[in-house]
């Protein structure tokens, strides 16, 4: 290879990333118009399009590089020089951290995810931790209650870029002040002020005002979800001011926000104060930088691994028929490998399973489906793997494992947030906790269905409980669109003997689902059955599911709330 080509390649990769992030910002900047026009289907399509941008632009750069090098192979020394040139381009670059991830992605695409070493890739960043460039304009604006909180909030809301009429701005401000007074007390509120992000955070059918409530005793989140009435008038649905509430809003089971962030590192750092429980990976994920979030997630894993003496073990819970799941006992993630062969009742391919996981990545997860990061050629040290797990890996996924002596390479796996399996949770709780869990499970099913997702396998073992007590679906191999399912009532038996027969007396076609049958496995536990019948009996009726299908086919997009119904102003104060 001629000298000087290394710099050209480095510049080509960075220019490719510039193009990708420019398109990312372009799609994001359309969020306000889509919201104001109430074009909810365009909102969903824009979300999918933005997710696809990254891989598309990686592919474009890879093709450019193959042309530049005439398809010739490159030796290790050449690649090291490319990375050195690329690193020199980053100190004055405003999005250096994601540019490093883009470099990694191009490298992995070129070399089929082989030789993934710190010398060749930005396994860890080349730049000082939390280093930021000069910000051309502040990310947020401060508001002080010099003339009272009503006046302050009127200024905040009047500063918003939204062009629609408000249904009743004074009413909403009154509700916010009432909430703040009840939360802080009159004296504390008088000594507090707001810092509000300049950009709105758009997701689903809401525009979120995100701010910080700075009080004498500390900083709290200040979140206002702005919705539209059927007449296209704006209203504020609630006010959230606890870190737990903010954590759920920015949760790993929700779709990514559309927020205009030309300097994502600065925005992540600004958010960190009101989301102290979120990792760097989770914050980047929340603002839509999912590929860099994958980089940060892998770094968090490496840091944890370096500081612990644990071994990987099979994850707690009932062993899956499609996925082999393992974890580190103290780590908050699980690792999921598609088995070589599935249980006989699972009539599907590995390609189908991967397609299901991609569907979840692109779909509106409505706070009820865990996000995943997908990895290829994932290296594990054998000394970190328990003997029992090693035996299980070789038994269930040998075709996906390469033995390198001291290490193994797993060809493909997913990393996902670790939760307590719902079936285990239900065994451990009683009273109100049990009731809350059953209510949450039913709500999860309803919200998934309203978002055009049918879980397929609805057993409790396929759901998990988060640290906030939310129930989240995480087993996707049988997932499908609601509109693909034929929900049927079980026909009446022709003769008394029909009910005693081992085979059904009616025909069953692929795609047929009989909701009456859900009762057999969801209500078998005498502690659970009565609660389920009380709160979710309609889930056992085919007409309930068919009515949802009709709404979906008519183009209706349901509202998705990242908080309890009782927190809505329309419920709380009316």
UniProtKB/Swiss-Prot annotation:
Q: Which compartments is it annotated to reside in?
A: Cytoplasm
Give the Enzyme Commission number: 2.7.11.5, 3.1.3.-
Which GO BP annotation is one of this protein's? glucose metabolic process
Active-site positions on this chain: 371
Q: What positions does the entry give for ATP binding?
A: 315-321, 336
Region forming the signal peptide:
none
Report the domain of life of the source organism.
Answer: Bacteria
GO cellular component terms, semicolon-separated: cytoplasm
Task: Please give the catalytic activity noted in the UniProt record.
Answer: L-seryl-[isocitrate dehydrogenase] + ATP = O-phospho-L-seryl-[isocitrate dehydrogenase] + ADP + H(+)
Q: Which UniProt keywords apply?
A: ATP-binding, Cytoplasm, Glyoxylate bypass, Hydrolase, Kinase, Nucleotide-binding, Protein phosphatase, Serine/threonine-protein kinase, Transferase, Tricarboxylic acid cycle
Any one GO MF annotation of this record? phosphoprotein phosphatase activity
Pfam families, per database record: AceK_kinase (PF06315), AceK_regulatory (PF20423)
* Its job: Bifunctional enzyme which can phosphorylate or dephosphorylate isocitrate dehydrogenase (IDH) on a specific serine residue. This is a regulatory mechanism which enables bacteria to bypass the Krebs cycle via the glyoxylate shunt in response to the source of carbon. When bacteria are grown on glucose, IDH is fully active and unphosphorylated, but when grown on acetate or ethanol, the activity of IDH declines drastically concomitant with its phosphorylation.
Q: Which family does it belong to?
A: Belongs to the AceK family.
Family annotation (NCBIfam families): PRK02946.1 (NF002804)
What this protein is called in its record is Isocitrate dehydrogenase kinase/phosphatase
């Amino acid at each position: 290879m001629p000298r000087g080509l290394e710099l050209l390649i480095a510049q080509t990769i960075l220019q490719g990333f510039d193009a990708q992030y420019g398109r990312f910002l372009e799609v994001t900047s359309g969020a306000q118009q889509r919201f104001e026009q109430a074009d909810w289907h365009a909102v969903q399509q824009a979300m999918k399009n933005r997710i696809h941008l990254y891989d598309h632009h990686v592919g474009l750069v890879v093709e450019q590089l193959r042309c530049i090098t005439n398809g010739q192979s490159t030796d290790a020394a050449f690649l090291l020089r490319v990375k050195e040139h690329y690193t020199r381009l980053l100190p004055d670059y405003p999005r250096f951290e994601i540019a490093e991830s883009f470099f990694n992605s191009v490298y992995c695409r070129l070399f089929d995810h082989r030789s993934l070493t710190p010398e060749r890739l930005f396994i860890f960043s080349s730049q000082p931790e939390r280093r930021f460039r000069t910000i051309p304009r502040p990310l947020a604006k401060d508001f002080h209650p010099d003339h009272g909180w009503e006046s302050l909030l009127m200024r905040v809301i009047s500063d918003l870029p939204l062009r629609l009429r408000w249904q009743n701005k004074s009413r909403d401000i009154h509700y916010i002040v009432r909430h703040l007074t009840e939360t802080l007390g009159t004296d504390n509120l008088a000594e507090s002020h707001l810092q509000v992000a300049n950009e709105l955070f758009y997701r689903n059918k809401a525009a979120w005002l995100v701010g910080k409530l700075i009080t004498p005793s500390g900083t709290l989140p200040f979140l206002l979800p702005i919705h539209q009435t059927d007449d296209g008038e704006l209203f504020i649905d609630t006010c959230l001011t606890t870190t737990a509430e903010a954590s759920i809003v920015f949760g790993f089971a929700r779709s990514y926000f559309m927020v205009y962030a030309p300097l994502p590192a600065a925005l992540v750092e600004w958010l960190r104060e009101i989301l102290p429980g979120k990792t760097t990976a989770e914050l980047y994920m929340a603002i839509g930088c999912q590929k860099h979030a994958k980089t940060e997630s892998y770094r968090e894993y490496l840091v944890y691994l370096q500081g612990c003496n644990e071994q990987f073990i099979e994850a707690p819970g009932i062993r899956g028929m499609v996925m082999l799941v393992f974890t580190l006992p103290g780590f908050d993630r699980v690792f999921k490998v598609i088995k070589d062969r599935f249980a006989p009742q699972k009539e599907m391919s590995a390609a189908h399973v991967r397609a299901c996981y991609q569907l979840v990545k692109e779909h509106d997860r409505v706070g009820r489906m865990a996000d995943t990061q997908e990895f290829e050629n994932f290296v594990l040290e054998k000394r970190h793997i328990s003997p029992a797990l090693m035996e299980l890996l070789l038994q269930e996924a040998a075709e996906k494992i390469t033995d390198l002596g001291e290490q193994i390479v797993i060809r493909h796996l997913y990393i996902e947030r670790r939760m307590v399996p719902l079936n285990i949770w239900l065994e451990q709780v009683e009273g109100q906790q049990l009731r809350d869990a059953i209510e949450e499970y039913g709500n999860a099913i309803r919200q998934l269905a309203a978002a055009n997702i049918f879980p397929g396998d609805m057993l409790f073992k396929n759901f998990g409980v988060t640290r906030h007590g939310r129930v989240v679906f995480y087993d996707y191999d049988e997932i499908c669109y609601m509109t693909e399912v034929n929900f049927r009532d079980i026909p009446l038996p022709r003769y008394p003997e029909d009910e005693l027969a081992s085979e059904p007396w009616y025909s069953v076609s692929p795609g047929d689902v009989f909701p009456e049958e859900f009762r057999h496995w969801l209500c078998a536990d005498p502690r659970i059955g009565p609660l389920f019948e009380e709160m979710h009996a309609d889930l056992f009726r085919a007409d309930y599911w068919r009515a949802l299908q009709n709404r979906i086919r008519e183009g209706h997009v349901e509202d998705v709330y990242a908080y309890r119904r009782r927190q809505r102003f329309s419920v709380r104060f009316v």
